[in-house]
Amino acid sequence: MRVLETIATLREYRKSLKESVGFVPTMGALHRGHQSLIERSLKENSHTIVSVFVNPTQFGANEDFSAYPRPLEKDLALCEKLGVSAVFAPKIGEMYPYEIEQRLKLYAPTFLSHSLEGAARKGHFDGVVQVVLRLFHLTNPTRAYFGKKDVQQLLIVQHLVQDLLLDIEIVPCEIVRDSDHLALSSRNVYLNATERKQALAIPKALENIKQAIDKGEKACEKLKKLGLEILETLEVDYLEFCNHKLEPLKTIEPTNTLILVAARVGKTRLLDNLWV
């Protein structure tokens, strides 16, 4: 496995690859969710490149950029064990050679980025677009793999590829959950034992909503009330029912409904969602 730290070495390496290339962008602190993305890429491509880069432009002023876990050696060991072709692990100066005021301004599409996570984390998706587009240009992948847990990010990246006419297939991958049904996240390490138990209200709320839908309930307001009752011990940022353009729904639309939740457990903010 190659470990590439500079753009020059990545470009040289990429030129040597003549067959399909899968790309898995990450911020490190790899868990089984990331592993599932990597394994799918390995199955579907001749080569797989994983990036490990904690992107500063997607963190807000009061967010945990400096505290974000960076176990690089552990991440590299996992990638090598899985059979990854190369890991791109650049420094900030490699990815952002210019100071903020000198950079080209890139913005996420407003209709997908102004609500939900975009409302809670101003500028977050602009930062995501900044780094994803740079990584796509550098790796020039055949396919890129994104988890459905960060559904708003996934929709924005899909739109980015379509709008800028990029010849990249975006592959959405299912949410991976622990045995207690909590969605895997690098931020789960911040939870103590008590908070971990409290966090289980999130998947339980989604499961109960799904059961109600399966029994015939279609009114989003009633379903939301059901979910909020289960989430009452948490600080809920939102529980919303949207279509795939993130437009609010009043009734469930089969195959076109997303149920998205964000809630704080102690100081840790967790996301989850359900595709209906």
UniProtKB/Swiss-Prot annotation:
Chain segments annotated as transmembrane: none
E.C. designation(s): 6.3.2.1
Keywords linked to the UniProt accession: ATP-binding, Cytoplasm, Ligase, Nucleotide-binding, Pantothenate biosynthesis
Catalysed transformations (reactions): (R)-pantoate + beta-alanine + ATP = (R)-pantothenate + AMP + diphosphate + H(+)
Main enzyme class: ligase
Pfam families: Pantoate_ligase
Record-given protein name: Pantothenate synthetase
Naturally occurring in which organism (per UniProt): Helicobacter pylori (strain G27)
